[in-house]
C-alpha cells in the first residue's frame, strides 16, 4: 500500500442519474501533467479495489477532481457513487497517461475530442495556460446522448472566461462545441459524423482538419476512439506511436487496452 495515498473527499456533485464528480484532498507529493490519470479506489474485503481515472482538475490546484459514471453493478463505481464528504479514498502516487501536450507536434489548432466521461482529462487541459500559449485555437468537442449529460457546461462557458489568470486567452482561443445525439439541441449528431460531413468546421469557422495546422487528442469509448482515429487518419494526421514520441494526435491508450 506504500504506492497509495489516502485522500479525503471534500465534495460530491451529482450531475444526473448516471454521472457524478467529486473533489478530494491532494497529497503535496503528487505531481502530474495535465491530461494524465491515476488509479483511485476503495478498500473492499480488506484489499484495495482500484481503477484508472483521469484527473479533471489542473495540476496547480490543491485538490483533485474526478468525473465518473455510475454503474449499478460495477465493482468500484457501484460503491464510488455513494461517496460523501469526509469519506476516504485511495489514490496512486504514480500518475501516467498518453494525453500530454508534450507528445504533440507543433500546430495551430488543438482539437480535443471527447464523449461522456472522456471529457475529464480535457477539463484539466483547458485550465492549463500553457495550452493557450502553444495553440491559436483550442476546440473542445463533447459528445453525449442527452442534454443533461453535458457536465461542466456552465463552468466552461461562464466560469473559465472569468479566470483572472487566463480568462482572456479562453475568450480568444477556446471553442466549446457540445453535441447531443438523442435529443434536440443546437448541435446534433455524433462528432465523427460532424467531422466527416464538414458541418463541425462550418459551425466553428475553421477549415477542415489538415496535417500542417491541426493536432488532436481523443478520449472516449473504445468504439469512439477507433472511429475518431479513422477520421483523423483520413484527414492525413498521424498518431503518436508511443509515449515520448510526438505525433499529430494522441489517444489515451490505457483505457483502450483494458
Swiss-Prot record:
Disulfide bonds: none annotated. It catalyses: 2 reduced [2Fe-2S]-[ferredoxin] + NADP(+) + H(+) = 2 oxidized [2Fe-2S]-[ferredoxin] + NADPH. Its EC number is 1.18.1.2. Residues 2-102 form the FAD-binding FR-type domain. GO terms for molecular function: ferredoxin-NADP+ reductase activity; nucleotide binding. It comes from the Bacteria. FAD binds at residues 51-54, 67-69, 74-77, 117, 254-258. NADP(+) binds at residues 17, 144-145, 181-182, 190. Induction: Overexpressed under N(2)-fixing conditions. Pfam families: FAD_binding_6 (PF00970), NAD_binding_1 (PF00175). Keywords: FAD, Flavoprotein, NADP, Nucleotide-binding, Oxidoreductase. GO terms for biological process: cellular response to oxidative stress; heme catabolic process. InterPro entries: Cbr1-like_FAD-bd_dom, FAD-bd_FR_type, Flavoprot_Pyr_Nucl_cyt_Rdtase, FNR_bac, FNR_nucleotide-bd, FNR_type-1, OxRdtase_FAD/NAD-bd, Riboflavin_synthase-like_b-brl. PANTHER family: FLAVODOXIN_FERREDOXIN--NADP REDUCTASE, OXIDOREDUCTASE FAD/NAD(P)-BINDING DOMAIN PROTEIN. Monomer. Belongs to the ferredoxin--NADP reductase type 1 family. This is Ferredoxin--NADP reductase. It comes from Azotobacter vinelandii.
Amino acid at each position: 500500500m506504500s504506492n497509495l495515498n489516502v485522500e479525503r473527499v471534500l465534495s460530491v456533485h451529482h450531475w444526473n442519474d448516471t454521472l457524478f464528480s467529486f473533489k478530494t484532498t491532494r497529497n503535496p507529493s503528487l505531481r502530474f501533467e495535465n491530461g494524465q490519470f491515476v488509479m483511485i479506489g476503495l478498500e473492499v474485503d480488506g484489499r484495495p479495489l482500484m481503477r484508472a481515472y483521469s484527473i479533471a482538475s489542473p495540476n496547480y490546484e490543491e485538490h483533485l477532481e474526478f468525473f465518473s459514471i455510475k454503474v449499478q453493478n460495477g465493482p468500484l463505481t457501484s460503491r464510488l457513487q455513494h461517496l460523501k464528504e469526509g469519506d476516504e479514498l485511495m489514490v496512486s502516487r504514480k500518475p501516467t497517461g498518453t494525453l500530454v501536450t508534450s507528445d504533440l507536434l507543433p500546430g495551430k489548432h488543438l482539437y480535443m475530442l471527447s464523449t461522456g466521461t472522456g471529457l475529464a482529462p480535457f477539463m484539466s487541459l483547458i485550465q492549463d495556460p500553457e495550452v493557450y500559449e502553444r495553440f491559436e485555437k483550442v476546440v473542445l468537442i463533447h459528445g453525449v446522448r442527452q442534454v443533461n449529460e453535458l457536465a461542466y457546461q456552465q463552468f466552461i462557458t461562464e466560469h473559465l472566461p472569468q479566470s483572472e489568470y487566463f480568462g482572456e486567452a479562453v475568450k480568444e482561443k477556446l471553442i466549446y462545441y457540445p453535441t447531443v445525439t438523442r435529443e434536440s439541441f443546437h448541435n446534433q449528431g455524433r462528432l465523427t459524423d460532424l467531422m466527416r460531413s464538414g458541418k463541425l468546421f462550418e459551425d466553428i469557422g475553421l477549415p477542415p482538419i489538415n496535417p500542417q495546422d491541426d493536432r488532436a487528442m481523443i478520449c472516449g469509448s473504445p468504439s469512439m476512439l477507433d472511429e475518431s482515429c479513422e477520421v483523423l487518419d483520413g484527414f492525413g494526421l498521424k498518431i503518436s506511436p508511443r509515449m515520448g514520441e510526438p505525433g499529430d494526435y494522441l489517444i489515451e491508450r490505457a483505457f483502450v487496452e483494458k
